[in-house]
């Protein structure tokens, strides 16, 4: 008896499309024949996962499955005479999902290369002529705000799968291959299942050759016939100004090497912005907090302020109020698109000392009694001025 498709993917019946796709990718990677050679249980799980995804990823099929169970799905996926039915074209969704996993969603690479794209009714997928496409490699690159502001070039050492030097990436001592004895060169395995509505054909990658159609002769002892091994390479990454945290750069062909001569995957560099001890980022602008004493705010002054380009002299106007924002043009972060840079804003606040000397305390008391700086007196004068103006208007 067939398992429930939702149980196969480990989902509830209210699962969203994204949840279905995510679960499928995880399980397909887990049970893929390349990772589980000669493992019949894994092969069976792989087939079940493919079948469940093929049904639940299609809105119409999912509706029929929810209403009628497996019989509802089989009616659209089968036809008489062993030919492909309407559901066969939906296998392109499966290979498209594999494309996302192995080739970053590109037209080339992944299972599209292995099978040559989705076949039409009664069609056949071609096998890859140059091995399986290598997987993408993702790394994180930490950058300072100064590096992000101006752009930077980094030289990185990364560990990845590289072509075996002993066999030149072929997987064979002599470089010779032979037709796969399991799939006889087709690169795929077909299993037919009869239902009350007709015959359903399930097509999967050949577990022996991984969909290539050929297997190596005289396996290389260094790479065990895979044509790849773990190595370390040096890569230069040019990061433009203005990138943000979690932005990424894609270096085509710099990822893991493909088994047995397959094309390289891509290297995906994810930007990670380091927190700055002085500046706070706001888009392409930066904010710096400056604390000044009360006399400097009242009388005005000139102070040295740090920027992403070094120190600059900033003029503080007399009677500057706390929380005032002063602008330093062109000292922010370079624009990712277009020329120019953002600005730096200096937020001015008053510095209040935790301790004062007895002499300073007396000076502050004397200053407190001055009507020029008393907030209460100032408020009274403003209110009086308002009423005086009102009286003048209506008199």
From Swiss-Prot:
An example molecular function term from Gene Ontology annotations: heat shock protein binding
Record text on subunit structure and interactions: Homodimer.
Cellular location(s): Cytoplasm
Organism: Chlorobium phaeobacteroides (strain DSM 266 / SMG 266 / 2430)
Gene coding for it: dnaJ
GO cellular component, one term: cytoplasm
CXXCXGXG motif repeat copies, ranges: 164-171, 180-187, 206-213, 220-227
Domain notes from UniProt: The J domain is necessary and sufficient to stimulate DnaK ATPase activity. Zinc center 1 plays an important role in the autonomous, DnaK-independent chaperone activity of DnaJ. Zinc center 2 is essential for interaction with DnaK and for DnaJ activity.
Gene3D superfamilies, alphabetized: DnaJ domain, Heat shock protein DnaJ, cysteine-rich domain, Urease metallochaperone UreE, N-terminal domain
Residue positions binding Zn(2+) 1: 164, 167, 220, 223
Protein name: Chaperone protein DnaJ
Entry annotated with the keyword Cell membrane: no
Location of the J domain: 4-69
Record function comment: Participates actively in the response to hyperosmotic and heat shock by preventing the aggregation of stress-denatured proteins and by disaggregating proteins, also in an autonomous, DnaK-independent fashion. Unfolded proteins bind initially to DnaJ; upon interaction with the DnaJ-bound protein, DnaK hydrolyzes its bound ATP, resulting in the formation of a stable complex. GrpE releases ADP from DnaK; ATP binding to DnaK triggers the release of the substrate protein, thus completing the reaction cycle.
Residues that coordinate or bind Zn(2+) 2: 180, 183, 206, 209
Main location: cytoplasm
